[in-house]
Amino acid sequence: MTDKLQFPDGFLWGGATAANQCEGAYNEDGRGLANVDVVPIGPDRHAIITGQKKMFDFEEGYFYPAKDGIDMYHRYKEDIALFGEMGFKTYRLSIAWSRIFPKGDELEPNEAGLQFYEDLFKECHKYGIEPLVTITHFDCPMHLITEYGGWRSRKMLECYERLCRTLFTRYKGLVNYWLTFNEINMILHAPFMGAGLCFEEGENEEQVKYQAAHHELVASAIATKLAHEIDPNNKVGCMLAAGQNYPHTCAPRDVWAGLEEDRKNYFFIDVQARGEYPNYAKKEWKRQGITVEMTEQDLQLLKDHTVDFISFSYYASRVASGDPAEREKTAGNIFASLKNPYLESSEWGWQIDPLGLRITLNTIWDRYQKPMFIVENGLGAVDTPNEDGEIEDGYRIDYLAAHVKAMREAINEDGVVLWGYTTWGCIDLVSAGTGEMKKRYGFIYVDRDNEGKGSLERSRKKSFYWYKEVIATNGASVN
């Protein structure tokens, strides 16, 4: 039976990055300032990304890793050649909004920014790599935040629509796979990064978050509509930070807590995939005194323009309890979870659960019956070169192999429809959560440290050759 388990022909293997974590060149060729540029490494980072502390420009005494990233803006040809050497079928990347519209509300785009991405996409096609493009990945021009309050304002719909129309028109024939917002549910956990939100003292933060979420959901529907009109070959997906919530015990209140936590996550895809707000959300808003302003036109857009596929990031499952204050916690993707005593953890406390990926795939498939795409998965670890300068990252290979097996089982034994898999940070980049460089995910090592020092030289890790073989055999090399 095992030898019959395989990945479908045309399965899209690849890797993923984000503009704000790798491009650098924050002020070159007309690019404007963005929210992620001014998020520093250090103890204030969490307060800033959660909207509790305002930082709208660079301040003395801080180091801002996104300003330079890994200098992919100047080195993308070298990097894409390495992706081509691995045999990537797809490369997920994001557009820096402020490269295209530096302030965000201009009527005409910045040609230098448009040309940069056109050249990059053509470089991908040179190696037979299909671009998978995230329109906004924790990225908002700073002017839209200081002038309008970010996604709390309906003004953002107009600006985002102009961005999308520009991208879909310019890159018609070069890009056919689009994601509207990265990890859209992170607006609840990292609202400054996810939506450019900062809160005033005494403000109803949940009200602001859900109003901004409504604007992003409508914007996503507008993008889907435009993409299909401009090029019928376009496929548009949503993107969620996923991971099943297990009940801490079989106590009914723990099971209920897990269901509630899952609903908070799936709320966004419920709207994007089904086209309407779920009843449980309306009831919860009423209980909390939240009034989300929306028009009949908004609701019609949501209904008429659902996504073609569902993409998500998966790093770990989570644990929920009816008494969370009494339970031990562990780190996770931006926000913490309760600790699962049955799982091992990474150096950053993220718990390792490949079966959880299979469970998550089945949950999403059963809930929506839409094709899926895993667009982030990987192990953040400290990689130390040996005396020969090589990275022997067998721990990363073990992690990824276990998750590849889980995908294969979900496809062959459970019948889910999965289009592709892009590992996160296929080349080392700046961590979104911590701002660190030493938390590495890549198959390609980048010589740069947490203080911005290093040659930026690229080198292949052991996992580089492993993943190359995985792709060449369409997953058959993973036993």
PLM feature spans:
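A common structural microfeature
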Residues: 10-12, 73, 90
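Glycine-rich, proline-tolerant flexible connector loops at the mouths of alpha/beta enzymes
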Residues: 95-109
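Catalytic domains of carbohydrate-active enzymes, especially glycoside hydrolases
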Residues: 75-96, 304-310
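Internal amphipathic alpha-helical repeat/solenoid segments
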Residues: 69-81, 102, 113
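Active-site region of glycoside hydrolase catalytic domains
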Residues: 2-60, 103-105, 114-479
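A short acidic, glycine/proline-enriched capping/turn motif at secondary-structure boundaries
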Residues: 89, 98-100, 138-140
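Active-site mouth loops of central-metabolism enzymes
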Residues: 61-75, 152-155
